[in-house]
Amino acid sequence: MPALWLGCCLCFSLLLPAARATSRREVCDCNGKSRQCIFDRELHRQTGNGFRCLNCNDNTDGIHCEKCKNGFYRHRERDRCLPCNCNSKGSLSARCDNSGRCSCKPGVTGARCDRCLPGFHMLTDAGCTQDQRLLDSKCDCDPAGIAGPCDAGRCVCKPAVTGERCDRCRSGYYNLDGGNPEGCTQCFCYGHSASCRSSAEYSVHKITSTFHQDVDGWKAVQRNGSPAKLQWSQRHQDVFSSAQRLDPVYFVAPAKFLGNQQVSYGQSLSFDYRVDRGGRHPSAHDVILEGAGLRITAPLMPLGKTLPCGLTKTYTFRLNEHPSNNWSPQLSYFEYRRLLRNLTALRIRATYGEYSTGYIDNVTLISARPVSGAPAPWVEQCICPVGYKGQFCQDCASGYKRDSARLGPFGTCIPCNCQGGGACDPDTGDCYSGDENPDIECADCPIGFYNDPHDPRSCKPCPCHNGFSCSVMPETEEVVCNNCPPGVTGARCELCADGYFGDPFGEHGPVRPCQPCQCNNNVDPSASGNCDRLTGRCLKCIHNTAGIYCDQCKAGYFGDPLAPNPADKCRACNCNPMGSEPVGCRSDGTCVCKPGFGGPNCEHGAFSCPACYNQVKIQMDQFMQQLQRMEALISKAQGGDGVVPDTELEGRMQQAEQALQDILRDAQISEGASRSLGLQLAKVRSQENSYQSRLDDLKMTVERVRALGSQYQNRVRDTHRLITQMQLSLAESEASLGNTNIPASDHYVGPNGFKSLAQEATRLAESHVESASNMEQLTRETEDYSKQALSLVRKALHEGVGSGSGSPDGAVVQGLVEKLEKTKSLAQQLTREATQAEIEADRSYQHSLRLLDSVSRLQGVSDQSFQVEEAKRIKQKADSLSSLVTRHMDEFKRTQKNLGNWKEEAQQLLQNGKSGREKSDQLLSRANLAKSRAQEALSMGNATFYEVESILKNLREFDLQVDNRKAEAEEAMKRLSYISQKVSDASDKTQQAERALGSAAADAQRAKNGAGEALEISSEIEQEIGSLNLEANVTADGALAMEKGLASLKSEMREVEGELERKELEFDTNMDAVQMVITEAQKVDTRAKNAGVTIQDTLNTLDGLLHLMDQPLSVDEEGLVLLEQKLSRAKTQINSQLRPMMSELEERARQQRGHLHLLETSIDGILADVKNLENIRDNLPPGCYNTQALEQQ
């Protein structure tokens, strides 16, 4: 068998040095950033996975392309890596953090380290240089308070800062902050005080939503308030919403961002946001804050810019009224503080236009809370005037009330108006202690009714369900129900409390009383929002559970989700990802295996293999037979059973070596074939790119032809327009000539009229010639471009078919054919227009001839007055124009015919190209199939090898774990007798102590009663007896507390005694200690009795003294002396006897408490040991500890 393993390892090691990535990500995991990797033996030895990715894309780097290159960053793990663009002079390195912020040199600031801090200048390779004017000892300014460099030795302070160094806030301001444009923050104090300072009781608190588990209470609404769909991305852990219409959708913040956010004034609200598709122009209403009847909005970016598409960016908004923060409308200081005190809505725009999608993440609101931590100096501590109290002067002091309850803490406090100057309620003004307000008489309303604040003499019924009582809020005069039943909350008792669900008023259907959520103990009871208050659907399942009631295991887990022990609930399937289906596992934990895999976790390859693996199997069987024969020979030689000829052994070794060389040669041939195939594929891609570029050139040529055709159309239209104008001119001339009265020869005035007519005819003839020339030029250009386009098509198709590689883009060629059809149609249209132009020109020519004939028939016209030669020349031009148009028409017809031939030739070439493409596609698919099969066989071999190694490693680790568990169990078993002894001793001591202290508690109670009687008798020694009473109370309370603690310990120890009854015989060893405790308890009892006797004597003495005091007439001087002596003896007796006894009782009680604490600590240790034993017992494997060997040699 060792030889068999050696052969398998050799075979796989020869195939492992180079491997290309396959579809099995478990073998070559490059996070989708690379398609190639190699095997690294050293990496496999260190991490268990030896595949290292090559040529990572998207600016990534690392073994699995899991990180960005140096100088790049990304917000999330799956995002693209973006360049840091750090300024080379101002940054320490080219690296940046996950937000793209670079590490700057001294004196440099900015996200890219591209500018100097205030007080610095001249950015160089060493950073920025500090302004020497600020370093001058005469100009020692506080950087947080200056508005710029000092001027002539004097610091220039910000508006709210004062002092020679600009290091103090002006009166009415506090918290000097360099990031505040004003320098300091104005005191708020609800307008009641202008004196304040930074509070030292508050620390920084961030209210965040990171969406790690769900939408965290966020919602999405339309602009009109109707709900929209909000989705949570488990992969990116953010939320997003999409729009199907132009109306925008808004993200709506949950309650934790609302309410009284007064301590967030001047701080920031930030979030990560990106938008995909749609319009990306910011609006003035991108971020909306509402509260206290006020509403302000702000854009995400300046309105002239555009939001980046598909790029996550952090947006930050400062919560104050400064104009630089772009809130609109601009509120006053107190209006902004009033809005934050009662913030009712925070909305952030999600979509921009139709089919737009917006994503939001990492929403953070900087706030503060009164706990220890990083200080929050922006929270104020007001110094209140008379009549006010509280940190912010928000309450009225005792003896004062609000002049207007509607204004709440903004209202002025005025003195109470009660009879006798009594105190009153600071909010309502109602007088206390029977003092009535003389101006107002309030009716005494029964339960279920309340006083109308506008008419205190009348009662109105409470708007509460089932007649619960109610009250009126003084600030808002809102009627709020009190004493809602368990599980019900709300101003009208209309909502179910947290942890309950139902519909008590039936607002969403039938009435359903509130009842506890049924989540099967699979939620965190300390968390809020575990279930939907209306439907009861569980929202925060834990222990790997899921479902409406957390009664199912999550995908990829199995077990009993209803088990009482969390460890027995849902556990991971632990399926081999390479051999199992992605559906998870069955209810018993067994995995659903892919074909060819088996085992509980699909970690073993099945015996049946695909048919394509038969040749590999046959070859491996032959190798196995040869290895078995070699193993038999070696065994004989080692056993001495016979002498094996060296020649036979050498022959077998040579055969094995030859077989291994054949395997190596086959692997190298396969690698060479794969490399050759890769080169061929690269050549095909290169030729395809070249062909694509030629097709692009052809597209451009066709576009130029179409542009020239458009120009030709324009020129034809111009020619048509000129012909129309010429016809109109000729018609006007004819009409004028027809209306002309030709006089006799003796009345002839001159040749000027006919001369002008001849000139007009000449001008029209010249325009016809020019139009015909333009048509001829355009036709020639169109023909040239058509020939060029046809030549390009022939050349591209010829090269594509002749190369036999790549597949021509059929859609592009078909588009070119369509464009040729359009060109042909255009040429036909031009032909028709040219024909029409020829007809119009001929008509004009005939009309001109008729005019000329009319002129020649005129009588009495002298040849000299009418230039006959000029008319003949015009006629010749018209004839030449007609012939020119005829010639152009012939050329157009020839071009049309040629276009038809070219079309047929192009279609034939296209058909040839398609057939060639089909052949090349077939060859390419066969090559890809062969390549994929080879890679799959290689990957399967690699996977099998590593599976065997993993199994061997797990078996060795399991063997070690079994040995460790066994040793722990044996050690724990040895400690059982010692633990049992400790538990028995503790039980005995606890019982004896309990019995001993029982009488001490009763005696202490009697002492307390006696001290109380003594207090009532004598007023002169009231202070001493009072202290005695206080001490007795403390002693009694301690005794009672110890008694209760002993009772609880007794109940716990009874459970232990039931399991350890066999140890009762060993209790005798501790009787001495018990006897000592009893003796001390008896001493305590005796002293307590003595204390009782002493107290009784003291009481008798005090009775006598009081008796004497009640009879002053019968007391003489001797009686007074006797009275003083008795009083002195009573005091001495109390100080010398009673007080030491009480001190001793207190000391005994303290010692008993110490003994009880030691007992509790010992019992806790014993219980911890018992719990540890139970864990060891649960973790021990069932059955026999001595397992058989995995292999028999």
UniProtKB/Swiss-Prot annotation:
PROSITE patterns according to UniProt: EGF_1 (PS00022), EGF_2 (PS01186), EGF_LAM_1 (PS01248), EGF_LAM_2 (PS50027), LAMININ_IVA (PS51115)
Ranges of residues in domain Laminin EGF-like: 28-83, 84-130, 139-186, 187-196, 382-415, 416-461, 462-516, 517-572, 573-602
Classification via CDD domains: EGF_Lam (cd00055)
Recorded GO MF terms: heparin binding
Record GO biological process: cell adhesion; epidermis development; positive regulation of cell migration; positive regulation of cell population proliferation
Post-translational modification as stated in the protein's UniProt record: O-glycosylated; contains chondroitin sulfate (CS). CS attachment is on either Ser-803 or Ser-805.
Subcellular location: Secreted, Extracellular space, Extracellular matrix, Basement membrane
Region (Domain II and I): 603-1193
Tissue expression as described in the entry: The large variant is expressed only in specific epithelial cells of embryonic and neonatal tissues. In 17-week old embryo the small variant is found in cerebral cortex, lung, and distal tubes of kidney, but not in epithelia except for distal tubuli.
Cysteine pairs bridged by disulfides in the record: 28-37, 30-53, 56-65, 68-81, 84-96, 86-102, 104-113, 116-128, 139-150, 141-155, 157-166, 169-184, 462-470, 464-481, 484-493, 496-514, 517-531, 519-538, 541-550, 553-570, 573-585, 575-591, 593-602
InterPro entries: EGF-like_dom (IPR000742), Laminin/Netrin_ECM (IPR050440), Laminin_IV (IPR000034), LE_dom (IPR002049)
Cited Gene3D superfamilies: Laminin (2.10.25.10)
UniProt-annotated glycosylation sites, renumbered to this chain: 342, 362, 803, 805, 942, 1033
Main location (coarse class): secreted
Keywords assigned by UniProt, alphabetized: Basement membrane, Cell adhesion, Coiled coil, Disulfide bond, Epidermolysis bullosa, Extracellular matrix, Glycoprotein, Heparin-binding, Laminin EGF-like domain, Proteoglycan, Repeat, Secreted, Signal
GO cellular component labels: cell cortex; collagen-containing extracellular matrix; extracellular region; extracellular space; laminin-2 complex; perinuclear region of cytoplasm
Domain of life from the UniProt record: Eukaryota
Domain comment quoted from the record: The alpha-helical domains I and II are thought to interact with other laminin chains to form a coiled coil structure. Domain IV is globular.
Further facts: Binds heparin.
Noted disease: Epidermolysis bullosa, junctional 3A, intermediate: A form of epidermolysis bullosa, a genodermatosis characterized by recurrent blistering, fragility of the skin and mucosal epithelia, and erosions caused by minor mechanical trauma. JEB3A is an autosomal recessive, intermediate form in which blistering lesions occur between the epidermis and the dermis at the lamina lucida level of the basement membrane zone. Epidermolysis bullosa, junctional 3B, severe: A form of epidermolysis bullosa, a genodermatosis characterized by recurrent blistering, fragility of the skin and mucosal epithelia, and erosions caused by minor mechanical trauma. JEB3B is an autosomal recessive form in which blistering lesions occur between the epidermis and the dermis at the lamina lucida level of the basement membrane zone.
Role, per record: Binding to cells via a high affinity receptor, laminin is thought to mediate the attachment, migration and organization of cells into tissues during embryonic development by interacting with other extracellular matrix components. Ladsin exerts cell-scattering activity toward a wide variety of cells, including epithelial, endothelial, and fibroblastic cells.
Oligomer and partners: Laminin is a complex glycoprotein, consisting of three different polypeptide chains (alpha, beta, gamma), which are bound to each other by disulfide bonds into a cross-shaped molecule comprising one long and three short arms with globules at each end. Gamma-2 is a subunit of laminin-5 (laminin-332 or epiligrin/kalinin/nicein).
Protein name stated in the entry: Laminin subunit gamma-2
Species annotation: Homo sapiens
Lineage, uppermost ranks: Eukaryota, Metazoa, Chordata, Craniata, Vertebrata
Name of the encoding gene: LAMC2
